[in-house]
A protein has these predicted regions:
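Residue-level signal for inorganic ion chemistry
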Residues: 29, 65, 87, 109, ...
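Rossmann-like NAD(P) dinucleotide-binding subdomain of oxidoreductase/dehydrogenase enzymes
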Residues: 121-269, 321, 395
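ALDH superfamily catalytic-core signature
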Residues: 191, 233-376, 403, 440, ...
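Short alpha-helical
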Residues: 41, 78, 82, 93, ...
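N-terminal Rossmann-like NAD(P)+-binding subdomain of aldehyde/semialdehyde dehydrogenases
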Residues: 1-131
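Structural signal for hydrophobic packing residues in well-ordered secondary-structure cores
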Residues: 54, 58, 73-80, 84, ...
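A structural signal for short, well-ordered beta-strand elements
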Residues: 22, 36, 58-59, 91, ...
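Conserved C-terminal structural/oligomerization subdomain of aldehyde/semialdehyde dehydrogenase
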Residues: 28-34, 198, 223, 260, ...
């Protein structure tokens, strides 16, 4: 099945059939490919090629660069079903999530095409007669993208489409757990490039490998920007290395996202939002809902409703109409069980969280989503666990709810369910949520392309995708032009 998908997507069989490193599907643990890992020497070669590609590509007008991305979006539309199914096989996502991720790629292509005609600078009034000032934006250089397993194709597209319309060349180092989807994306992109006369060779490249390959990309002084998605631990390694050589980084790291459930909330709507946000993608989104901060007046009722909903959710093969697929691997399962044991030791009451379908899928890790009622926001609650665990804590005072929302190291996404406009506005104010995303009456997951995506604190501070995130992929230049016959100095200085 996977081989047929890869064949239709145009991937050379030699790239996924003859390597020494096996690729296993989280669906059933079966081997779906074997890839050859590349290391520092191959990265060095790729960066050299990317430098040449950048030198040519930056000279191509931005709207023309956008045309390449437009054509890539059309190819993604044509192969959406196949690529979405491949995402399911390699990352364990249910059908709708696999298709949705490819749709994100299509959406960011559309956004980037429009952006290619809107890379606006500024005109600035000069204090000197016969002068004008302006601010312009120019291509940056070689961009390195390091992505995680949980969004194996969308995050690459967020970065690459913007990087391309901004005039850069891209090298992608995907997660070692999801190399096949990366090879497929590269094959689809190359279909477009080979018929696009202005596109130089090696405009986009993929490096398949482990930590050595990623480290080589991060350390190379010719790579102007590293955009890295992953754990906070990974970010702590990447950020100092990039900063030491005065390059740029866009970091999208951990999230420990909360929902404040106010006493006036629509509980029917809240249950639906919690279910999607807390158990979707088996709790393996960076924006997964991990903490429910519920007002004491509604806490018991919402927990009762959630337990009923959790008991009915369909768990199983992600391509067979179920709502929860597997965890990515045994390591993910072990981390979940360790967190639940710690929660019990800290006074929590655990509902769910056990392994499921072990007889049917002995080499895969399906679990029932867990609800954990906690007496307080303890250490385990403040730690991100990449699994479907929802911690529930109560509050009585709205100020306390805001404090709990912000009292974790991470700052990615957050939300409030309320019909009280004062609560909603305060939540979004300067004294409200300290996260990069703060939603009202919608969960923390499912961000749209048009808004910049990213968070604060240990989430890394980077922004990807929409709004003005494109500026991270360009260099700013301030210009002063003297069109007079004099040479006046700023601040009224005389130098005669």
């Amino acid at each position: 099945m996977v081989a047929a998908l890869l064949d239709r997507l145009g991937v050379n069989p030699a790239l996924y059939q003859s390597g020494k490193h096996p690729v296993h599907s989280p669906i059933d643990g079966s081997r779906i490919g074997s890839v050859q890992w590349e290391g520092a020497a191959e990265v060095e070669q790729q960066v050299s090629r990317a430098e040449h590609a950048f030198d040519a590509w930056r000279k191509v007008p931005a709207p023309r660069r956008g045309e390449l991305v437009r054509q890539f979006g059309d190819v993604l539309r044509e192969y959406k079903a196949d690529l979405g199914e491949l995402v399911s096989w390699e990352a364990g996502k249910i059908t709708q999530e696999g298709l949705g991720e490819v749709q994100e790629m299509i959406d960011i292509c559309d956004f980037a095409v429009g952006l290619s005609r809107q890379l606006y600078g500024l005109t600035i009034a000069s204090e000197r007669p016969g002068h004008h000032m302006r601010e312009t934006w120019h291509p940056l250089g070689v961009v390195g993208v390091i992505s995680a397993f949980n969004f194996p194709v969308a995050v690459w597209a967020w970065n690459t489409t913007l990087a391309l319309v901004c005039g850069n060349a891209v090298i992608w180092k995907p997660s070692e757990k999801t190399p096949l989807t990366a090879l497929a994306c590269q094959a689809l992109f190359e279909r477009v490039v080979k018929n696009f006369s202005d596109a130089p060779p090696y405009l986009s490249q993929v490096i398949i490998g482990g930590r050595d390959a990623g480290a080589a990309l991060v350390d190379d002084p010719r790579v102007a920007l590293i955009s890295a998605t992953g754990s906070t631990r990974m970010g702590r390694e990447v950020a100092p290395k990039v900063a030491a050589r005065f390059a740029r980084s866009i970091l999208e790291l951990g999230g420990n996202n909360a929902m404040i459930l106010g006493p006036s909330a629509d509980l029917d709507m809240a249950v639906r939002a919690i279910l999607f946000s807390a158990v979707g993608t088996a709790g393996q989104r960076c924006t997964t809902l991990r903490r429910l901060i519920a007002h004491e007046s509604v806490k018991e009722e919402i927990v009762t409703r959630l337990k009923a909903a959790y008991s009915k959710v369909r768990i199983g093969h992600p391509l067979e109409g179920n709502l929860i697929g597997p965890l990515i691997d045994k390591h993910g399962f072990d981390n979940m069980q360790d967190a639940l044991e710690q929660a019990l030791s800290e006074g929590g009451k655990v509902f769910g969280g056990k392994r499921q379908l072990e007889d049917k899928f002995p080499n895969a890790y399906y679990v029932s989503p867990a609800i954990v009622e906690m007496p307080e926001q303890s250490d385990v609650v403040c730690t991100e666990t990449f699994a479907p665990i929802l911690y529930v804590v109560g509050y009585t005072d709205f100020t306390e709810a805001l404090r709990l929302n912000n009292a974790v190291p991470q700052g990615l996404s957050s939300c409030i369910f309320t019909t009280d406009v004062r609560e909603a506005e305060q939540f979004m104010s300067a004294v409200g949520s300290d996260c990069g995303i703060a939603n009202v009456n919608i969960g923390p997951s499912g961000a749209e392309i048009g808004g910049a995506f990213g968070g604060e604190k240990e989430t890394g501070g980077g922004r990807e995708s929409g709004s003005d995130a494109w500026r991270g992929y360009m260099r700013r230049q301030t210009n002063t032009v003297n069109y007079s016959l004099e040479l006046p100095l700023a601040q009224g200085i005389t130098f005669d």
